[in-house]
């Protein structure tokens, strides 16, 4: 008889692009270059629901917990 204790594996993906069909961007929230759009940062951030990093991409932190 072989005894195998339960193993737990924690997988963390700190930066994972959101998948909304094409390009991983939320609908209506495409990246806007700072040279083209010179609005205040507060106005640009208020236009999208998800937080935007410095590159204009929307990211979601996803953690997975697997138990075997």
Curated annotation (Swiss-Prot):
<dbReference type="GO" id="GO:0017015">
    <property type="term" value="P:regulation of transforming growth factor beta receptor signaling pathway"/>
</dbReference>
<dbReference type="GO" id="GO:0045664">
    <property type="term" value="P:regulation of neuron differentiation"/>
</dbReference>
<protein>
    <recommendedName>
        <fullName>Neuronal regeneration-related protein</fullName>
    </recommendedName>
</protein>
<dbReference type="InterPro" id="IPR024417">
    <property type="entry name" value="Neuronal_3.1"/>
</dbReference>
<dbReference type="Pfam" id="PF11092">
    <property type="entry name" value="Alveol-reg_P311"/>
</dbReference>
<dbReference type="GO" id="GO:0031103">
    <property type="term" value="P:axon regeneration"/>
</dbReference>
């Amino acid at each position: 008889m072989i005894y195998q204790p339960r193993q737990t594996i924690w997988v963390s993906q700190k930066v994972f692009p959101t998948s909304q069909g094409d390009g991983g961007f939320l609908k209506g929230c495409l990246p806007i270059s700072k040279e083209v759009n010179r609005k205040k940062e507060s106005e640009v951030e208020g236009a999208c629901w998800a937080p935007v990093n410095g590159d204009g991409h929307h990211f979601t932190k996803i953690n997975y917990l697997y138990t075997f």
